[in-house]
């Protein structure tokens, strides 16, 4: 069980693990993000980069979120340990066809907290738009709950092969850029 009010935040879903944010919530948030991205991008199988920070709760939330994304038919592109900037850069560069990104992190908050923040690449401008839980995800969750679709999560298979190597690609791009600025 999780605190439904966390879906009313503007910028992210964030709370104390496991009392407020947990694997069940991460699964549903992953599902809602994938459904929102599919509709917004008019793409039934959007590719979504997923990263996580080094908090002890992040691997479990990461796995659940990836499964929630995969449950919709969207393609999760797991990149493992990363920074928010790396995930956003990957989406901006459309690595492996990615049009959205999700990061498991609670940023500057104490270690008992964790969170989920996400972005969608704006096809018209190329910029990244924040996916707001309150504005974009809560209504999707509520519709699923009303129809019974938001019952207990089921595990969905997802690619466990090599990840995006986001850290290496990000570092290489940064080094290339610094050489060109010299």
Identify what each model region corresponds to.
Residues 11, 52-53, 104-107, 116, ...:
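Fold-independent oxyanion-binding glycine-rich loops
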Residues 35, 43, 47-113:
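N-terminal small/polar loop signature for handling phosphorylated ligands or for N-terminal nucleophile
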Residues 16-19, 23, 55, 84, ...:
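Short, electropositive, low-hydrophobicity segments enriched in small/polar residues
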Residues 1-67, 71-72, 163-182:
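An N-terminal, well-structured beta->alpha segment
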Residues 26-28, 67, 94, 119-122:
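Hydrophobic alpha-helical segments
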Residues 114-182:
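Gly/Ser/Thr-enriched, mixed-charge loops and adjacent short helices
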